[in-house]
């Protein structure tokens, strides 16, 4: 159902060691079964935020919690580690994320949001969801695509711990932009549209 490679498990265990005791991992999906599906990984305290609709998937030293209705969408999901300009980060491959529970045919050989002809917008959303946001989530943050301009510039917006973070400019220019341009050669650049407000929520102050 949900596979986490050994290297990814070790990485998560290390991250959890810096958190409050009994902290686990939550796997959530926004708009499952649609072309706009987005998955997210975050820290989770089961005793503090108990949800009767949750199921627990146990691993050797931690557990993943998710809502029961997501089971059909996370079949054959793999969480792994990749290295790029953002450093070491989590990567999520979930081929069934965009399909309805009632779909009779699932193409497991592709992971694009739009399986027939992925647009630049959908390619970027896919990369943000599966490669970049899993890493930012460990800092309590995320980034989303606002729009693609007529000259192929991606307008992005930071959320959570990335809003007001002193490392935001470095992250978007040295990490996110390089990653997106490498995977999407037609992209001409990235602009941060966030109205940054430093505060206790910011990861780096």
Swiss-Prot record:
Coiled coil: none annotated. Keywords: 4Fe-4S, Iron, Iron-sulfur, Metal-binding. Gene3D superfamilies: Fe-S cluster assembly (FSCA), HesB-like domain. It holds the Pfam family Fe-S_biosyn. It comes from the Bacteria. Involved in iron-sulfur cluster biogenesis. Binds a 4Fe-4S cluster, can transfer this cluster to apoproteins, and thereby intervenes in the maturation of Fe/S proteins. Could also act as a scaffold/chaperone for damaged Fe/S proteins. Homodimer. This is Fe/S biogenesis protein NfuA.
């Amino acid at each position: 159902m949900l596979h986490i490679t050994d290297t990814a498990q070790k990485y998560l265990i290390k991250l959890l060691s810096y958190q409050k005791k009994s902290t686990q991992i939550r796997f959530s999906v926004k708009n499952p079964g649609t072309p706009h599906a987005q998955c997210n990984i975050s820290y989770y305290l089961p005793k503090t935020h108990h949800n009767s609709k949750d199921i627990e998937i146990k691993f050797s030293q931690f557990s993943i919690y998710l809502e029961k209705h997501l089971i059909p969408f996370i079949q054959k999901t793999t969480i792994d580690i990749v290295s790029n300009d953002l450093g070491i980060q989590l990567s999520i491959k979930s081929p069934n994320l965009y399909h309805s529970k009632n779909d009779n045919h699932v193409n497991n050989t592709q992971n694009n949001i739009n399986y027939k002809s992925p647009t630049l917008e959908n390619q970027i959303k896919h990369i943000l969801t599966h490669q970049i946001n899993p890493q930012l989530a460990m800092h309590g943050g995320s980034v989303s695509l606002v729009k693609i301009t007529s000259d192929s510039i991606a307008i992005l917006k930071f959320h959570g711990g990335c809003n007001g973070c002193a490392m935001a400019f470095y992250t978007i220019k040295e990490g996110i932009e390089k990653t997106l341009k490498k995977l999407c050669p037609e992209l001409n650049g990235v602009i941060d549209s966030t109205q940054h407000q430093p505060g206790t929520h910011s990861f780096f102050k």
